[in-house]
Each structure stands twice: as structure tokens, then as C-alpha cells.
Amino acid sequence: MRKYENIYNLLIMKHFTALTIACFSLMNTHAFEPFANISIGAVSPDDLDASVSGFGAAAVPGTFELNGKESIKLEIGLKDDSGLSVGIQTAYNQMDIEDVSILGNPIGLALASLGAWNPAVPFDASGEVYTIPVLAFVGKEIPISDLLSIDLGFAAGYTTVEARPAGDLAGVFGQGNGNSWELQAKIGLDYQVSEKYSLGLDYSYSWLTGPEFGQAIAEDLGHHFIGASIGLNF
């Protein structure tokens, strides 16, 4: 199943690459300028479902309950006088592991059923998950007044996912790294402060294919981002 999922993701990336090249070719017919955007905000992730080994003879379903934390995003690219843009995006997203359940039960009870934990002792199932994407993006700026504009964008690329269990959870799951394909859709509202600077609000939703790290083979992960941005035109 994962083999066909990888083929599907590669097809998506192939079409997105073709779209990016087409947009860049179109830009060659217009005057364009380099720009950079920095967005600072927070992510709000979905819970991460995974197939977890180490709890019996076969892998069992588990859920990592995630809570979003800070996020910082950087975009560098080229924009033409029609508002079309292409470029590269990277980010640093941090999420906390709030709890872990195995077969619908708290992980402490799951371990107790195997004789590996005292059920009378609270289990500290904490930790952190980080994602660091490198994405190519295409965007379109749509003016709604002389100073305000709506910024639409779509990005795709490769993402590193790192899990760092802490507390008692670190004794069950080791630290692990995995990689995912990521697709992202974005909408923003920008205010042009001057010819060179703009301020804005950004919202995006990212979808990541399931990373594999340590004892967990994760399913797809989604997370929301909302933050404030500052833009610089060179």
C-alpha cells in the first residue's frame, strides 16, 4: 500500500514541478523582482495515528496526541508585475507530545498489561515533534485596494520529521527521524507599508505523508499555521 502511495506522491510532485516551471517561464515575459517573507506564528496539528511495534507479536494502532507550538517560516523568491511568484520556502515547526494511546488505551495501561509498568504510577508521555520542510511554491497576489492584497499560494516538497520522546516515553520510544512529502495551501492578507515593505496575516494548511521513525510507522499528518508576516521587496 505504501508503495502505491509513494508512486502517487511522486506523480503529484512531477505535475507540481511542471507547473512551477511553466509559471517561471511565464514570468520571463514580465519584469520581476526578488522578495523575501518571514512569518512567525503557531501550528495547530492533528493527532498523529501510527502503527506501533513493541506491544506484542504484531504492530498495533496507536495515537500520538499533539499540541502545536511556535513556528517560523521563510520564503525567498521572484515576483513579476502581474503578482505571479515562484520560490523556495523553509520553516521550523515545533509540536508537543501531550499523550500517547495504544489500542485506544493510555500507554501506561498498555504497558501494565504486558507487565512492563506499574499501573499505580502515572506515566509521563511527553516529548516533542519537529518538522523542517524545504518546499517549492507558486503564488498569486490579487489586489483589493491600493494598499491591500490577497496572497494565494501552493507549495510542495520534502520535509524532515523528528520525534524526541521525553519523560517515561523516552524509555519506550527512542528518538527518531523520518522524511515525508508535504503539500501546502496558503492564503494571506498583505498591507503595503511602503514600496519595499509589507505586513500581513498568513494562514496555511499542510498535509504530510506518513513518516517512519523508530518503532512507529505514522499515517498522514495535517497541521494548520496562522501567523504574522513581514515582506521585503529588493
Question: Which residue stretches match the model-derived regions?
Answer:
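Cleavable N-terminal export/targeting peptides
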Residues: 1-35
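Predominantly the C-terminal beta-signal and adjacent terminal strand-loop region
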Residues: 49-52, 60-62, 95-98, 110-117, ...
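Surface-exposed strand-loop-strand hairpins of Gram-negative outer-membrane beta-barrel proteins
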Residues: 44-72, 178-179
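Sequence/structural signature of outer-membrane beta-barrel proteins
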Residues: 43-47, 95-97, 158-170, 178, ...
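Conserved binding-pocket/active-site segment within a compact domain
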Residues: 162-182, 186-192, 197-200
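Gram-negative (and chloroplast) outer-membrane scaffold detector with strong preference
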Residues: 33, 40-42, 70-167, 191, ...
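Hydrophobic alpha-helical segments of small multi-pass membrane proteins
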Residues: 136, 154-158, 179-187, 205
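Extracellular loop and loop/strand-boundary signature of outer-membrane beta-barrel proteins
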Residues: 57-63, 120-126, 168-175, 211-218
